[in-house]
Amino acid sequence: MPRHGVSPGQGLPRSGREQASDRSLGAPCLRLLWLGLALALALPNSPVLWSPAEARPLPTQGHPAKFIRIAPQLQEAFGWWNLTCPTCKGLFTAIDFGLRNQASVAWVGSVAIKLCVLLKIAPPAVCQSAVQLFEDDMVEVWTRSVLSPSEACGLLLGSSCGHWDIFSSWNISLPAVPKPPPQPPKPPAPGSPVSRVLFLTDLHWDHDYLEGTDPNCENPLCCRRDSGPPPASQPGAGYWGEYSKCDLPLRTLESLLSGLGPAGPFDMVYWTGDIPAHNIWQQSRQDQLRALTTITALVKKFLGPVPVYPAVGNHESTPVNGFPPPFIKGNQSSHWLYEAMAEAWEPWLPAEALRTLRIGGFYALSPRPGLRLISLNMNFCSRENFWLLINSTDPAGQLQWLVGELQAAEDRGDKVHIIGHIPPGHCLKSWSWNYYRIVERYENTLAGQFFGHTHVDEFEVFYDEETLSRPLSVAFLAPSATTYIGLNPGYRVYQIDGNYSGSSHVVLDHETYIMNLTEANEPGATPHWYLLYRARETYGLPNALPTAWHDLVYRMRKDTQLFQTFWFLYHKGHPPSEPCGTPCRLATLCAQLSARSDSPALCRHLVPDASLPDVQSLWSMPLLC
């Protein structure tokens, strides 16, 4: 339970400068940078345009439109955190218009910068850097795609914005081998070995973090060298981190890793990505590789011989979320990143795992007898991966490969853990529904699923597809190391049925540890990492199997005090100041049942007297770029 006499309903004290809206600023940040390039092709007859001397030719294609007519409306309604459906459609219509009528990527970029500033999408410096970073890849993607503006926005913003089905009617082939009868795992015998697995995710190291700078600057990421000083009446960024739109200095990550002793010892480590900071408008490949090598070296230094098994996050690439499928070759491919990962992680991974990592950023290995670990590249399911506009049908053949791995494990009698970054309930519909189907088919083999990305502490329950009523698996979504946005730093430890013959390898319990930033940033204080809570003890769970998590959701529907405890822990002991009333509570609980995207039927029993689309619309999925 929470320490220091702080009740779950109150949370830890917030600084006076923090605004209630701060937490929301990070949610759509990828789309905003996406948007910077989309604007590039608008207003082709504007008097502010100029033609660079060195113009690279563009292919022509498109649906002509008059984007200029909606520009005044956009200027009035559009903000840094507000991408509406009409705006999205206008922007992609403008893309087609520009590609048809203009002749250079450089021209496209010049218009994008001017419109980004005009419509106040971002500060001028961010507009300039973002457009220059995204323009080449985005123009390449759009000229190779076959989507209309409505379909593109349906892909990015969901089915309520557009009908997107060009690539959605695909299915993974399952083997003809009959599915064995469901066999829920049995509790281990008393005294059976228990393994402790350290889970790290979303570290987000900011090389330019600087104590004393403005934590509420105008840029998407603050507490940095270029953030400037805070207003005279406000304190600056804390030494160890800040409750704002800020990432972590290296010293806080060093403190985390050096202070793991009380939570250990660990048998292995699952590390699910997002190493670089959120300054996505100004990142180079060199920056990303520096983050990869620096943090990998830090993990090796403090964890020594403990085996570490990483997964690829959406922030590892630049532009952010840009993960081309393997059919994209040359300089625009992800070869530069996967090769660097293979080199950095070679001490932890066998040759076959390194081979598939180099191809598509995913791999499988056997960390111990009877257990198979599969690390997925969840960027191939992401709405924010703009390369999927070209073709989103099972990118890199990863899901079909997953089926092969699971069938082989079933044949051997092995159990399987899956790790990844983006949770399956946040994926493109076709990918998510296929993954859901795979999980149901191999429910006896699949012993655990572990993801990150959302920065908060939650889970996703899977059900049988026929009735959507029998819980059969659960994906654990662990909280982030970073404070972004307005959170305490944290990490997770899983207790797993241990290494012995006949082990189920299922999760028995989990623990969450945090650093209380309020205390750590006090003058003369030293950072302290402490146990925030244990899941079974805090929630009164009989075990950590899927049915227990299903039951917890429905208990929280009726027990508001229990939900307030969950809400407090969901935010790592630092919840927003605004209360979470009934609509917020139902939407949050619906998210815990939604391991399959665009599937409101999963919440039908949770809100029998309400409109399911209305309730689901209240759940703002944390699309942290």
From Swiss-Prot:
Residues 81-165 form the Saposin B-type domain. Binds 2 Zn(2+) ions per subunit. Its main location: other. The keyword Ribosomal protein does not apply. Residues 1-20 are annotated as: Disordered. Its cofactor is Zn(2+). Zn(2+) 1 binds at residues 202, 204, 274, 455. Its EC number is 3.1.4.12, 3.1.4.3. InterPro entries: ASM_C, ASMase/PPN1_MPP, Calcineurin-like_PHP_ApaH, Metallo-depent_PP-like, Saposin-like, SaposinB_dom, Sphingomy_PDE. Glycans are attached at residues 82, 171, 331, 391, 499, 516. Disulfide bonds join 85-161, 88-153, 116-127, 217-222, 223-246, 381-427, 580-584, 590-603. Residues 1-40 form the signal peptide. The modification Phosphoserine is found at residue 504. Hydrolysis of liposomal sphingomyelin is stimulated by incorporation of diacylglycerol (DAG), ceramide and free fatty acids into the liposomal membranes. Phosphatidylcholine hydrolysis is inhibited by incorporation of cholesterol, ceramide, DAG, monoacylglycerol and fatty acids. CDD domains: MPP_ASMase (cd00842). Belongs to the acid sphingomyelinase family. This is Sphingomyelin phosphodiesterase. It comes from Bos taurus (Bovine).
